[in-house]
């Protein structure tokens, strides 16, 4: 399948069910790709889900169904508010390799520029070479590692930090 017929939009609290659906799908389908666990999110109240939409969340919809997600978490400190972290990155398996991830990242980047973000950052598992290569193709560079940054099933996995300048 290609990414044609997919609509990407910044969602609001009125679309909390779509957010919940795609986020839980992501955590269930790709548990090693996220620092969070399915069980941590499954128990959230509806209000907690709504509260998480205080930060920008973009969802890709195909025929009204959520098929991808990316979020943006802006730094709070006034001296760091020009930076934001890309979070919750997930594309349904059948749509990977179609350009949908690029389109979601473009939507996030455009929104970030519009709200004064100058640098995007993200963390990715050192074991996820496919994601690392994708981010490199999109202009991200590794800027550091946290040895054993993620503990999964008793195993310590390095967390790779990457960044991309949006301006300057």
Question: Model-flagged regions — what are they?
Answer:
Residues 5-7:
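Extreme N-terminal starter segment of soluble prokaryotic enzymes
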Residues 10-21, 25-94, 105-107, 111, ...:
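Acetyl-CoA-dependent GNAT
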Residues 1-3, 50-51:
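Short, conserved catalytic or adaptor-binding loops enriched in Gly and charged residues
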Residues 98:
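Flexible nucleotide-binding loop
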Residues 49, 101, 123, 129:
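Contiguous, function-dense segments enriched for cysteine-driven chemistry
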Residues 118, 125-132, 137-144, 148-168:
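C-terminal "cap" of GNAT-fold acetyltransferases
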């Amino acid at each position: 399948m290609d990414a044609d017929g997919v609509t990407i939009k910044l969602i609001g609290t009125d679309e909390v069910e779509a957010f919940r659906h795609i986020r839980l799908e992501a955590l269930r389908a790709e548990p090693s790709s996220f620092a969070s666990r399915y069980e941590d999110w499954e128990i959230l109240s509806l209000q907690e889900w709504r509260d998480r939409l205080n930060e920008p969340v973009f969802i890709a919809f195909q025929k009204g169904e959520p098929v991808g997600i990316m979020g943006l978490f802006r730094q709070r400190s006034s001296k760091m508010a020009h930076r934001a972290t890309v979070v919750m990155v997930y594309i349904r398996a059948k749509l990977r390799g179609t350009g949908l991830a690029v389109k979601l990242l473009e939507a996030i980047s455009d929104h970030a520029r519009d709200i004064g973000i100058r640098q995007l950052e993200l963390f990715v598992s050192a074991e996820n070479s496919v994601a690392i290569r994708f981010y490199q193709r999109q202009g991200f560079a590794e800027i550091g590692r946290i040895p054993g940054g993620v503990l999964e099933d008793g195993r310590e996995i390095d967390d790779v930090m990457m960044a991309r300048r949006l301006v300057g």
